[in-house]
Regions:
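Intrinsic, short, N-terminal disordered tails of RNA polymerase sigma-factor systems
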Residues: 1-255
C-alpha cells in the first residue's frame, strides 16, 4: 500500500472497542466462549498451519490434521485456561502450545479424526498453502524460536489484514458501496510490483468523476483502518496491550 493508506492514516486515531476474544475465551458463558474461540481460530489458524509446515517440516496433509486438532483443544477449553495475558502475548502462547502439541502428537499412536468438531471456522488450507509457496520459505529451515516468533508475527498481521479486507468487502456490499471496495482493491491491494493505475484511469473504467475516486478511496481506507484495528483489539487483553500492538504491528501512534 502507498504511504497515505497505512493503517494509521493521517491521524492514527483509535476506535472505541470493548470486546476482547482473549478474555472472553475463558468466559463461563458457553455462547460467549464459543464466539471468542471462533474469532481466535479465524485469526490464528493460518499462521499456525504455516508455522507447523515450516518449523516442524510437516507435509501439507499432516499440517492440516495437526492444525485442526490443535484448535480442537482450544475449543475444549484446555489450553487457554493457562494463558496469562500479563506474562505473554497470545501468539507467543499459541506457538509454545503448538510446539508441545505437535511434539506430543508425534509420540502418540492415536490421531484425532480430521474435522471431528475441531472448529466451526472456515479453514481454506489450499489458500494457505498457496500463500506459503508464493512466499518461497525454506521448508527445511531449522529456525530458532526467536525467528519463528518473528515469522508468526508477520503471518498474524497477514491474517488480520486478510480478515479486515473480507469484512470491508462485506460491509461495502451491504451498504451499497461495492464500487468503493473495488477501487480500494485495485488501487491499494493489487498494485504490488506493477504500474499503479491512475485516478483518471479508474474514473474512466468505473465511469465516475476523478473526485469520486478520491472520495471513495478515502472512505474505503478509513473503514479498512477501523476494521483492522477492531480485529486487532479483539486479539488483545487490555487497552495497554492493544496500543502497544497497534504501534508495533500497524505503525499506529496513539494520541
Amino acid at each position: 500500500m502507498t504511504e497515505d493508506t497505512k493503517i494509521g492514516g493521517a491521524s492514527g486515531r483509535f476506535p472505541a472497542t470493548h470486546w476482547s476474544a482473549v478474555l472472553a475465551a475463558r468466559s463461563d458463558d458457553p455462547a460467549e466462549r464459543s464466539r471468542a474461540l471462533e474469532a481466535i481460530a479465524a485469526a490464528y489458524w493460518k499462521p499456525i498451519y504455516k508455522y507447523v509446515r515450516i518449523r516442524w517440516g510437516k507435509s501439507n496433509e499432516d499440517a492440516k490434521d495437526l492444525t485442526q486438532d490443535f484448535f480442537a483443544k482450544l475449543f475444549e477449553k484446555e489450553y487457554l485456561d493457562d494463558f496469562d495475558p500479563a506474562k505473554a502475548r497470545l501468539r507467543t502462547f499459541l506457538r509454545i502450545c503448538a510446539d508441545r502439541f505437535v511434539a506430543n502428537e508425534a509420540k502418540a499412536a492415536k490421531r484425532l479424526k480430521r474435522g471431528g468438531g475441531a472448529t466451526h471456522a472456515s479453514l481454506d488450507f489450499d489458500a494457505a498453502e498457496n500463500e506459503l509457496q508464493r512466499a518461497d520459505h525454506d521448508m527445511q529451515l531449522a529456525a530458532s524460536s526467536e525467528s519463528m516468533d518473528d515469522f508468526l508475527e508477520k503471518e498474524f498481521i497477514r491474517s488480520l489484514f486478510g480478515i479486515a479486507v473480507d469484512k470491508l468487502r462485506s460491509e461495502c456490499e451491504s451498504r451499497g458501496k461495492l464500487i468503493h471496495f473495488r477501487l480500494f482493491e485495485i488501487y491499494d491491494l493489487e498494485a504490488d510490483g506493477a504500474r499503479k493505475t491512475s485516478y483518471a484511469e479508474l474514473a474512466k473504467e468505473f465511469q465516475i468523476a476523478p473526485t469520486d475516486v478520491t472520495n471513495h478511496l478515502a472512505f474505503a481506507r478509513r473503514e479498512f483502518r477501523r476494521i483492522a484495528l477492531d480485529c486487532l483489539r479483539e486479539m488483545t487483553a487490555s487497552e495497554d496491550e492493544f496500543r502497544r500492538e497497534a504501534r508495533a504491528l500497524l505503525g499506529v501512534v496513539p494520541e
